[in-house]
């Protein structure tokens, strides 16, 4: 009897294994084409999940690129993925084939965070009417509230003043600047979204930023990739909450802020910020079920803008200060240009940027070297496309490897070194390079780029105008190697800020 049970069990196991193998082969058959990009041999059911180092994705993709070329394929369980590398191939995909590659693949883990068919937000929204409606609204509303204008510039410089005051309170002692940078940049985006500025000591504010900081990597590691590739696992009770505790807590905090803000909204008054403008659109959209203006999508749109508008800029500024203490000669030259153009009294203005080519070059090189978003948000083909002679089928996930562009050895003189001269010509004039695309390119390029450029210039020049930064005495020289997550952050470091 025991033997019969054992035989039956083994028969079931063998049948299940053969069935899964058959399903796996049938799923892959459409990709067995002569012109499909090459790649590492996938394992049945798992694909290449075990061959990709999700703790250091850029280096893992670099090794595959060296072996298979600028366009290669991966299999994430049953999900086909094509990785695009190098300036020529990335521009072909994002710009030349932009209409056919602007879609987004489903991200099942985000369903747990509130992303639904009627609440797709902006960043991860499928390419179509909802995305167009929300992108148009976000761009126009941010413009209405001062992005690219003098009014917002004054907001940013005032916040930079608060940041400088906080740095002054450190009294030249060693400290890690990332927390204060997060607070200052967050206040800019909070002013746009909620028309509210937080005090740096506000307990709710500090908890919100701490939660967001601790969430880095939750949506980009091995566990996240497995859950996206095999979404049925998300049905396991309690698993999503355990896999993404900080992201869940952050989204809950944003929701609480929205509820409180909504109680103070007066539709008869002009909108105070983007949230008020969105609520007004929700009222207009009643009776139009196809509209993307609803309370659930407001939560997701705010999260998109909050994270994209804060995390990337504050992380870039953290890279900037790290590179200034590692390269004091560059810091001195920036300060000399600030003194010559702006002086020590007047606040920096965006109009100064055109007369400060070296400072502008340094900021661009910080973005290139820091490379905080090396793996772009995935795209998806909406029809068959040809890239670099390869045929990529409809429904394939595309990963534009922006790191391969920002570190392209055929473009940059010193791709692995911090070298501001990458953005200067022989006469010392600023030159923007075609391969500079930290904000991506094409239809899905970052909508917050104008705001980010303003913040980077004004915060950076205000800080270098007021302080000289150095490695604390007795501490080892910090590493310039990043810690991979989304975004890539500097290895934790401390600095001393001494008033000039």
Swiss-Prot record:
Broad EC category: oxidoreductase
GO molecular function terms listed in the Swiss-Prot or TrEMBL record: heme binding; iron ion binding; oxidoreductase activity, acting on paired donors, with incorporation or reduction of molecular oxygen, reduced flavin or flavoprotein as one donor, and incorporation of one atom of oxygen
UniProt topology in membrane: Peripheral membrane protein
Keywords: Endoplasmic reticulum, Heme, Iron, Membrane, Metal-binding, Microsome, Monooxygenase, Oxidoreductase
Reported cofactor(s): heme
InterPro entries hit by this protein: Cyt_P450, Cyt_P450_CS, Cyt_P450_E_grp-I, Cyt_P450_E_grp-I_CYP2D-like, Cyt_P450_sf, Cytochrome_P450_fam2
An annotated GO BP: arachidonate metabolic process
Principal place of residence: endoplasmic reticulum
Any Pfam family matching the protein: p450
Protein localization: Endoplasmic reticulum membrane; Microsome membrane
Cellular component GO terms held in the UniProt record: endoplasmic reticulum membrane
E.C. numbers: 1.14.14.-
Binding site for heme: 446
Annotated family: Belongs to the cytochrome P450 family.
The name this protein goes by in its record: Cytochrome P450 2D20
Native organism: Mesocricetus auratus (Golden hamster)
Gene: CYP2D20
